Every structure is written in structure tokens, then in C-alpha cells.
Amino acid sequence: MPDRRPVIALAALIALVPCAPCATAAAQDVTLAQATEMLRSTSHDEIQTGIQSLGLLGSPAGVEPLAARIRDGLAPDLLEAAIDTLTVLGRAEAGPVLFELSTHRRPEVRLRAVQAIAACRPRGADRALMTALSDASPDVRGAAARGLGEIGATAAIDSLFLAFDRGVPEAGPALGRLARPEHVTRVLESLGRVPFDQMRVVLTELLGRRDVPSRTKLDVIARLAEMATPEIGTFLQEFVEASAAPANDPVRRAAEDAITRIAR
């Protein structure tokens, strides 16, 4: 599925501007040089139009003037708009300024910065997102966990397990995306210790992956069958109903057998 966050960020950026249709029309007529010059203005509205123009232009050359203006200081709403524009541009060159913003005093700014890091995927993104797993804000911690899953940061597995154990539920789907067969034992150790509604997303991701061997999936289903709770029966039923595997697929058959045993 294509990443829709840059589209959403652009829509949010436009929505921040008063009289959005008028401002958008004006921004569309601005060149890169003009937008860059607007960022040097002391006028809130001019800076706002300059930021929006750079997002609409979509040029990688917009990253440097945006980063410079961010470092010079911006009003809170303009800072958020500038980060959203960097997200729209999706360029790795934005990494240094986004790393700086990921430690900003305001959690709203840190959240946007973490989301932008995941979208831009600069070098060092995995380290920055792993650090953000310990942020004081639960929203930032959750965004960091989601980002690690999205960028495929397999080096973050241990950090994600720790975050999951410490109550960051968003680490669950990331673990489901990133766990390798050798990590599955650790995933299964969480069953019965972590609420199953949080484990459900981990298992759904894990069982749905094509790169996970059938043998590993069979081990997961065998452990679920041992626990044999009604909610596990429901989960397995939903898994079978959503599966596109043929009737003779060993994983599907194991799930169906487990459903029958749990129902007795």
C-alpha cells in the first residue's frame, strides 16, 4: 500500500492557511526563488505562503531554505507547517534538522519530527526513532514505534521488545512486521503476559507475512492452540476467514484444527 502520509501532511498544511483556496492559488504562482525569499520575511503571512509554496512546488531544493528558517526560529504554527512541508518533500537531506527537532521542548513538535523522520528516511533514522521510543510523550513513543516498523528497522527489534513490555502498544505491529523466525520465541513469551488485544496485531502481522516460513507459523498456531482461550479461537477463525491460502495449506489446516479443539 502506498504511503499516504505526505498527501495527508499536504492537506493539513493547506488547511492551516486562512482562506486556504486563495492562499493556495497564490502559492501556486510562486517560484522556488520567490518562496525562498519569502521565508526571510518578518511577515507571518509571507512566511506562511513561502512554506506552502515550497510544499506545492515539491522541489528537493526546498529542504535547505526550510531547514535554515526553522533554525532561525518560527512561530509555533509556522514551525509545524514547515515540518509538514519537509514530510511532503520526503527528502533524506532533511534528516539533520529533523533530528534536532525530535528533541524539541514541545511534544507536538517532537511528534511531527518523528513522523517526518519516518517519511524522509534519512541516514540515522533508525537510531533517532529508537531514541524517541523513550520520549516522555506516549504519542511520540507510539509514532517512533510505528516509524521503525515502516522503515523496516530490523536493528531495532530489541528496543521494540523493550518498548512493548513497557506499555507502548504501537511496538506490537512493528514487531509483527520485523520479527524473524529466531525472534518468535520472544513474541510467544508475551502471550498470557500482555493483553491479547495487544498481541492480536503482532500475530496478525506475523502470520500474514510471506517471508515467514510455514514452520514458524505452525509453531505460533501450536502455542495458541495450547492456550485455547475463546478469544484465541475467535482470532484463529478470523485468520482463516481472511486467508487466501488453499484448503490444503498446512498453516490454514493447523488453524482450523486448533479452532475445532478450542470449540470442544
Predicted regions, residues:
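Boundary at the C-terminal end of the N-terminal hydrophobic targeting segment
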Residues: 22-27
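N-terminal, post-signal-peptide region of Sec/Tat-exported proteins
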Residues: 43-87
